[in-house]
């Protein structure tokens, strides 16, 4: 996650980690296997760094879910009349930020800039659902990064 945010914010990874105050490597759940035992990062830590640099981070969830309680069987996916995939793609095509989802085994994040995906693992490609899935990346949420105080143009 920090690599993708560093790419989207155009800051060196070392500077981003210094601003967060840790590298995510501390073992905090010793009973779990690698890499689940590691501290890693919460998106709020990265949002705080972005805010300190004058950027707002707004989530655009692919399939938002209504859920009356934190636990329990009740939930309802929000389906948009103009299609959730089109809405999600429009956000990626018209802004820059980070997309989180799952990779082949665990969570994964990539940076994006107006429809172009920059994967910290190396690949650079144009965004589409099929292109992401061809790279074994299954999207969940776009974190749009915009300068604070500027009105977004769609």
Task: Give the label of every model feature segment.
Residues 27-107, 112-122, 128-133:
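Conserved active-site-adjacent core of cysteine acyl-enzyme catalytic domains
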Residues 1-36, 52-53:
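Active-site nucleophile-adjacent alpha helix/oxyanion-hole segment immediately C-terminal to the catalytic cysteine
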Residues 8, 84, 146-148:
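Extracellular and analogous surface-interaction loops
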